[in-house]
UniProtKB/Swiss-Prot annotation:
This is RNA-binding protein Nova-2. CDD domains: KH-I_NOVA_rpt1, KH-I_NOVA_rpt2, KH-I_NOVA_rpt3. Interacts with PTBP2; the interaction is direct. GO terms for molecular function: mRNA binding; RNA binding; sequence-specific mRNA binding.
């Protein structure tokens, strides 16, 4: 097949070429390179412009050629279109800066979750997406971005101030590409993306995957999210049968087939201060993993709430499971009321809850308002923080400053339970560090605390971060001990 002639009109190509990943030179004509970018569907229209005028003008100004996947041809597991940019390094950076500007203009309506089953991922946009850039790079380029022992990506983050994460590398199956997520303020993201473009220039195989459609790709492709499964798929949820069973057991399947949790936010007035912040943090965590928190207010009783949250926790990754378990404990507490009744699972110490919320605030888990926060608004934790601040001045500037001091905490974890904290390939440990902002280190295998079979777990960070990490680890250990007690055959 003859190669397609260049389009002299510089108009975007929306008819995807054949899906193919092959070894080829990293440049096009006259030192041009390729950069593949994910674009949220809400931003595509403003990038293309009426009748394609905006993108045509962008191509004229930068000298780049820009191709987009068709309007409903999304990257697997997302509602984002694939954009392939061809041009000089300067052109790639200029086009991406324009795209990033449009991505930051997230419509207010996109941040409002739809009322759907909490056990299903929501289709609305996470406000944090406005502060992210998502690039798709071949494995070879990903290796250069990471560098030996992670040295290169660490340097990029230190020099740019952005947070750079790559989708998980699977064991066994070798994915052709990986997704790079860059998070931060506009200038930070720009610096990090420029550094990534430099690695694209250095990689002879950086143009090996130039497809913009994944509709006919055979085999798995990389997950657009930096944590969780390496493979692109719908958000991790319970299988349909298990979800239906859990919902039916909790009396949640009404005429509309909706599953909701009435304890939140209906029960929020019963809590205040650190408890309120902890609840809102947990809600925000579930939302960040694709669970619909809007359906948490459908007026169902707390017993039903606990049932659904337990079902969510059973099928979620550790960070989301910890959030769901925390909400379940509060749902039980709200249901018990002053009259008592069944004793709810004991909530964690107030100090840990407050620290968990503070750590979330310090590490960007507050959520963002429309327009990257410039227009006010914010996620549920923002409102909770304001309410708590009004009630008792919980999040004062002085207290936040005090929380910035570094602290070292050591805890003991039984040898046979260390695997539960590490997770497969260390994923659970990575998630806990990302969620809290603390650094967590586990002593080497065979290195025990004197006179015990316990490994030493060292947590370093601000007091908020260390307490939050300690809480997550203790919750995980307690949960794993309970599972093994009820199922003695379970190991590791």
């Amino acid at each position: 097949m003859e190669p397609e002639a260049p389009d002299s009109r510089k108009r975007p190509l929306e008819t995807p070429p054949e899906v193919v990943c092959t070894k080829r030179s990293n440049t096009g004509e006259e030192g041009e390179y390729f950069l593949k970018v994910l674009i949220p569907s809400y931003a595509a229209g403003s990038i293309i412009g009426k009748g394609g005028q905006t993108i045509v003008q962008l191509q004229k100004e930068t000298g780049a050629t820009i191709k987009l996947s068709k309007s409903k041809d999304f990257y697997p597991g997302t509602t984002e279109r694939v954009c392939l940019v061809q041009g000089t390094a300067e052109a790639l950076n200029a086009v991406h800066s324009f795209i990033a500007e449009k991505v930051r203009e997230i419509p207010q309506a996109m941040t409002k979750p739809e009322v759907v089953n909490i056990l299903q991922p929501q289709t609305t946009m996470n406000p944090d997406r406005a502060k992210q850039a998502k690039l798709i790079v071949p494995n070879s380029t990903a290796g250069l971005i990471i560098g030996k022992g992670g040295a290169t990506v660490k340097a990029v983050m230190e020099q740019s101030g952005a947070w750079v994460q790559l989708s998980q590398k699977p064991e066994g199956i070798n994915l052709q590409e990986r997704v790079v997520t860059v998070s931060g303020e506009p200038e930070q993201v720009h610096k990090a993306v420029s550094a990534i473009v430099q690695k694209v220039q250095e990689d002879p195989q950086s143009s090996s995957c130039l497809n913009i459609s994944y509709a006919n790709v055979a085999g798995p492709v990389a997950n657009s999210n930096p944590t969780g499964s390496p493979y692109a798929s719908p958000a991790d949820v319970l299988p349909a049968a298990a979800a239906a069973s859990a919902a039916a057991a909790s009396g949640l399947l009404g005429p509309a087939g909706l599953a909701g949790v009435g304890a939140f936010p209906a029960a929020l007035p019963a809590f205040s201060g650190t408890d309120l912040l902890a609840i809102s943090t947990a809600l925000n965590t579930l939302a960040s993993y694709g669970y619909n928190t809007n359906s948490l207010g459908l007026g169902l009783n707390s017993a039903a709430a606990s049932g659904v949250l337990a079902a969510v926790a059973a099928g979620a990754n550790p960070a989301a499971a910890a959030a769901a378990n925390l909400l379940a404990s509060y749902a039980g507490e709200a249901g018990a009321g002053p009259a008592g009744g069944a004793a709810p699972p004991p909530p964690p110490p107030p100090g840990a809850l407050g620290s968990f919320a503070l750590a979330a605030a310090a590490n960007g888990y507050l959520g963002a308002g429309a327009g990257g926060g410039a227009g006010g608004g914010g996620g549920p934790l923002v409102a909770a923080a304001a309410a708590a601040g009004a009630a008792g001045g919980f999040l004062t500037a002085e207290k936040l400053a005090a929380e910035s001091a570094k602290e070292l905490v050591e805890i003991a974890v039984p040898e046979n339970l260390v695997g539960a904290i590490l997770g497969k390939g260390g994923k659970t440990l990575v998630e806990y560090q990302e969620l809290t902002g603390a650094r967590i280190q586990i002593s080497k295998k065979g290195e025990f605390l004197p006179g015990t079979r316990n490994r030493r777990v060292t947590i370093t960070g601000s007091p908020a971060a260390t307490q939050a990490a300690q809480y997550l680890i203790s919750q995980r250990v307690t949960y794993e001990q309970g599972v093994r007690a009820s199922n003695p055959q379970k190991v590791g």
